[in-house]
Swiss-Prot record:
Alphabetized UniProt keyword annotations: Amidation, Hormone, Secreted
Protein name: Cardio-excitatory peptide 1
Broad class of where this protein is predominantly found: secreted
GO MF annotations, alphabetized: hormone activity
Annotated positions of the Phenylalanine amide modification: F11
Protein species of origin: Lissachatina fulica
The organism's place on the tree of life at top rank: Eukaryota
A GO term from the CC aspect: extracellular region
Keyword Secreted tagged: yes
Primary role: Potentiates the beat of the ventricle, and also has excitatory actions on the penis retractor muscle, the buccal muscle and the identified neurons controlling the buccal muscle movement of achatina.
UniProt-annotated location(s): Secreted
Amino acid sequence: SGQSWRPQGRF
């Protein structure tokens, strides 16, 4: 996946 604030995948 990939967040808007953290385009790393998952956090």
